[in-house]
Amino acid sequence: MKKQNLRSLAAQAVEQVVEQGQSLSNVLPPLQQKVSDKDKALLQELCFGVLRTLSQLEWLINKLMSRPMTGKQRTVHYLIMVGFYQLLHTRIPPHAALAETVEGAVAIKRPQLKGLINGVLRQFQRQQEALLAEFATSEARFLHPSWLLKRLQKSYPTQWEAIVEANNQRPPMWLRVNRTHHSRDSWLTLLQDAGMNGFPHSAYPDALRLESPAPVHALPGFEEGWVTVQDASAQGCVSFLAPQNGEKILDLCAAPGGKTTHILEAAPEAQVLAVDVDEQRLSRVYDNLKRLGMKATVKQGDGRYPAQWCGEQKFDRILLDAPCSATGVIRRHPDIKWLRRDRDIAELAKLQSEILDAIWPHLKSGGTLVYATCSVLPEENSQQILAFLQRTPDATLTGTGTPAQPGVQNLPGAEEGDGFFYAKLIKK
């Protein structure tokens, strides 16, 4: 395998996210195919790290360069960011960080700019202390776009700084123990026998946080389906849903299938229909079902038009993990900060309400619908459910909040989990 310059690959990945609006989960895997297994982790660290601290790196470039890099030289802008990130946030020796970053100019066919890159990075090293002192008083220090900061400040006047701080951390690795194979405690013993350790969640019975992240192939019984990687807060959805054997259950917006398989672990005799609008992502649902040795009906379909994929069918329980801004999982997907726009929130809220209204008639009388998002914004959460309850006379809220303040909102970092919202509705 030809030796690749990781800094240039990271710069290209970040450029595709920020300039072209592509998701890092789509951009990164093809680039990782080009590098050795040893280098995959560093490439990922550089991409995630630059996107996590982008506001800081952009601020530094504006301070140290008189004019922005544009056109075909734009990738160099991101290459310099990769250089700053290494000097500030990694243990890579500065001389190696500088040399590899400067060499990255050759890999992106801009060798004439090696001197410029070297000069900017060395200037930063000389002025680092003064620059960081000034940065610490700027709005950029929060590492969030200003539109999102304003929304968080308005919705959480006393908590917004804690939310921002949690969003800027590296996420822990949560697992879901498959209760059809092992209890959480018995699998934890296997984990400890393998030289690792984990900590159980206080509320969600299958959730276990690893002491430090590990590759999945090192986890006891991963290939056999004994355990799944899933954040604790995502596991809350099925706790609220409380599926039972023999029931017909709809998992709507199901990809990549983590909640589909969790439903089947909790109720192995349930009949589950998993539906998602994104055909490509449905392949992940099949993969998850196969690894865990489970069966469900999987269909491509738009939640706004259920008659197209389920006819007149009605369900005992529906889990609607609605499309949302994903503002609760920024620490896990830092590209979200730069992919979302303020105007997206109203559009997402409209889509959520359309799906809720369309799917409600497909819930049996006496049935349960759990509405969930990985957002922290009230427009997508409590306000969404409040409006739905007002226009839907046969819907009643149960066990999640109050009619005036419906739902349960987990904030990022609470018991080390992601930000998530849940509302449990019963059809009268």
From Swiss-Prot:
Annotated keywords: Cytoplasm, Methyltransferase, RNA-binding, rRNA processing, S-adenosyl-L-methionine, Transferase
EC number, UniProt record: 2.1.1.176
Pfam families: Methyltr_RsmB-F, NusB, RsmF-B_ferredox
UniProt-annotated binding residues for S-adenosyl-L-methionine: 253-259, 276, 302, 321
Record InterPro entries: MeTrfase_RsmB-F_NOP2_cat, MeTrfase_RsmB-F_NOP2_dom, NusB-like_sf, NusB_RsmB_TIM44, RCMT, rRNA_ssu_MeTfrase_B, rRNA_ssu_MeTfrase_B_ent, RsmB-like_ferredoxin
Record has Electron transport as a keyword: no
Active site: 374
Recorded family membership: Belongs to the class I-like SAM-binding methyltransferase superfamily. RsmB/NOP family.
Protein name per UniProt: Ribosomal RNA small subunit methyltransferase B
